[in-house]
Amino acid sequence: MMDKNAKIYVAGHRGMVGSAIIRCLEEQGYYNIITRTHKELDLCRQDEVEAFFEAEKPEYVFLAAAKVGGIVANSEALADFMYENMMLEMNVIHAAWRNGCKKLQFLGSSCIYPRMAPQPMKESCLLTSELEQTNEAYALAKISGLKYCEYLNRQYGTDYISVMPTNLYGPNDNYHPTHSHVLPALIRRFHEAMSRTSLM
């Protein structure tokens, strides 16, 4: 259990999951929550991330920041998705470790599991066969973040955990017609269809 006075950094606080984490923490009485916008702190820049962690020394970190998108975005910008996600993950996780962060929660993705994994999917399926090609770059970046946390735990005794959300939607989600995930895209289409129907 975290102390109510603990300094908590939520990376990705403007996104769907990050904003939900903030709401949950505030509802539970945590008030010493640190956030930074992308303009204030570029997580892909190691020097900026190191300086931030050295100055703030957060005790707990929720790493929900990521470059995300649906199948179209993932398949059109493979290099961008891999580079940006790997850079921000490694920078934040490494800076947290170097600055004595007590616990870190890394937000992974269900796309890290093989395309043809048996259902229901088990964690042991990780790295057993091919990934889905349309989001392979994103998946590889997320696997790298998960493994880096695992290796820090094994080598240095840190308490860094990875969680894999599946099919999320909610406030602050991306409802773009071609660059969102399945559920928000469907919600948008339903809403647009209902709006057109009510105008008739």
Residue spans for each PLM region:
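SDR active-site strand-loop-helix element
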Residues: 11, 36, 61-67, 104-110, ...
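N-terminal Rossmann NAD(P)H-binding glycine-rich loop of SDR-like oxidoreductase domains
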Residues: 5-28
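NAD(P)H-binding glycine-rich loop region in Rossmannoid oxidoreductase-like domains
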Residues: 46-86, 95-98
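Conserved Rossmann-fold NAD(P)-dependent oxidoreductase catalytic core, especially the SDR/UDP-sugar
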Residues: 4, 90-135, 161
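Active-site helix of classical SDR
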Residues: 137, 141
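Adenosine-cofactor binding site in Rossmann-like domains, unifying the SAM/SAH pocket
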Residues: 26-51
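NAD(P)-dependent short-chain dehydrogenase/reductase
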Residues: 116-125, 150-200
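Conserved cofactor-binding/catalytic machinery of classical short-chain dehydrogenase/reductase
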Residues: 45, 60, 88, 103, ...
